[in-house]
Amino acid sequence: MSKKVKVIFTILLALLVVGGLSKIFLSKHSSEYAYNIGDTVKIKDQSLVVNSVKTSMGEGNDKPKEGNEFLILNLTLKNNGGSELNYNPYSFQIENAKGEIKDRTFTAIDGKEALDKGTLAPGEEVTGTIVVQEPIGAKDLKLNYVPNIFKKDVATVKL
């Protein structure tokens, strides 16, 4: 095999691994440990609490797809460590009963409460919401928190 073909093969393999890493990891490990709404979930130097989950059919033109509803998850993330903690709303994913994983939904339904990306100093916490869209009355949903896709730290909260 020529050097050029080996390089292309290596790049493609790396893209496949990185691109599918979080979904593969979550489907393999997400059900091992599951917390409930209101539980404090500790992951290394941080903690997460899902404070509440509400449903909404939207407002005005900001509505879910037909047959779906918005789930508004209010959560608190705290930095218990000695250095800064970066956080991102894309670290949170919803897993349904079929094992399908979805990221947050772009909507204005949660307004100023929406969790954005940011940095927490030691001892600081942030409370905000993320919104997802699921079929009305969906059961057995889980929130997976993946603070770093390159490490094996995953927290799962039953919704």
Please report, for each region that a protein language model flagged, where it lies by residue.
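Conserved functional micro-motifs across diverse proteins
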Residues: 2-159
